[in-house]
Amino acid sequence: MTRPPAAAATVRRAVDAAGCAPVRDLVVAHARHERSDVAVPADWAEGVVGLIAAGRLDLFVAVVDGEAVGYASVTTDVATWSAAPYAHLDCLFVAQGRRDLGVGRLLVRAVVDHVRARGLGELQWQTPAWNEDAIRFYRRLGAQGRRKERFTWALAPGR
């Protein structure tokens, strides 16, 4: 199988169910790749469309020959120390077999252009410490790593 060149990939924003639905399989693969036990709900696209409509999430999809091969999602957060908003790259994923084609760079470029257009001056994200390929990719982009442990706490209703 011949791999298409990066120029064959396009990136678009997903804003409705039709645009978001093909991304669900990528989200499942991403969670598996990161060794997560999070279950991606069957109605994932509906939830994401609601977040997009509320202005809480932006979703970018990389497409090659009509197939979704990667995605990036961005939210806006605030940094208390600097008293400034920043963009948070919640997810960046390119399907196995579609990596090393420039798709990740295209997704990051779309995110950066979007973030700059919104007037935000910083993009932050995290990746598992064991994901050396991603760390190398981010460093090649010019990003700087900052060590920190990430925690999650599943809160039961009413607690």
Annotate each PLM feature:
Residues V49-V61, H88:
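A short helix-loop-beta-strand connector motif used in the catalytic cores of GNAT acetyltransferases and
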Residues V94, D100-D113, R136-R140:
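Conserved acetyl-CoA-binding loop-helix of GNAT-fold acetyltransferases
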Residues A9-D25:
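A short beta-loop-alpha structural element at the N-terminal edge
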Residues A17, D25-V49:
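Conserved GNAT-fold acetyl-CoA-binding loop/helix
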Residues A79-P85:
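A short, polar/charged loop-to-alpha-helix boundary motif
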Residues A95, P128, A156:
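Residue-level recognition of the GNAT/N-acetyltransferase active site
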Residues R116-T127:
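Conserved GNAT acetyl-CoA-binding A-motif
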Residues V61, E67-T76, H88, F93:
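Conserved beta-strand in the GNAT
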